[in-house]
């Protein structure tokens, strides 16, 4: 299980919004500081899960943005067959924060998940938001568009909190 907490700027004594989280993943964690980058037009990134994941799927290639934002992220090495390194949260240069939240899905929802799923996994979505979003609302639009176009690879129960200094969204 993991947890996330957002406190809006109108509820703090100093006017700052807060996003916090905890996860009990059984692997090593580390912080990475990723500089802003320019990428060649047409560059692709690999997203998804492998056939060896607890809920199998396949890796696909999707377009990388031509510019990605500077960000700090929390990465870890393993969870249920999702390819490492795995990102479960962070903060970018525009003040967009991401926190991955996991809770176990109901059995019937897991059974409904396609056995050869495609699309970005929860980690891919967190990383892409850190690279591309300029607001929490922008993060929701980016993730919605990616899932609509490519699908989503799940291992049964992930959501995200996308936050900035003005608002937060749970998706």
Please describe what each predicted stretch is.
Residues 2-121, 142-155, 159-171:
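A contiguous strand-loop segment
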Residues 120-136, 142:
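N-terminal leader/propeptide and maturation segments of large enzyme subunits in energy/redox metabolism
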């Amino acid at each position: 299980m993991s947890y996330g907490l957002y406190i809006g700027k109108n509820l703090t004594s100093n006017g700052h919004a807060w996003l916090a989280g905890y996860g009990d993943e059984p692997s090593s964690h580390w912080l990475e500081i990723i500089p802003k980058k320019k990428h060649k037009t047409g560059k692709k990134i690999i997203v998804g899960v492998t056939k060896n994941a607890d809920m199998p799927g396949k890796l696909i290639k999707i377009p990388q943005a031509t510019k990605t934002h500077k960000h700090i992220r929390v990465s870890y090495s393993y969870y249920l067959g999702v390819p490492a390194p795995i990102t479960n949260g962070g903060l970018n240069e525009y003040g967009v924060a991401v926190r991955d939240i996991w809770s176990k899905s109901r059995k019937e929802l897991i059974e409904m998940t396609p056995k050869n799923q495609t699309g970005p996994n929860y980690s891919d979505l967190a990383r892409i938001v850190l690279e591309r979003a300029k607001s929490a609302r922008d993060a929701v639009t980016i993730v919605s568009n990616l899932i609509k176009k490519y699908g989503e690879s799940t291992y049964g129960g992930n959501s995200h909190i996308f936050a900035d200094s003005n608002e937060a969204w749970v998706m």
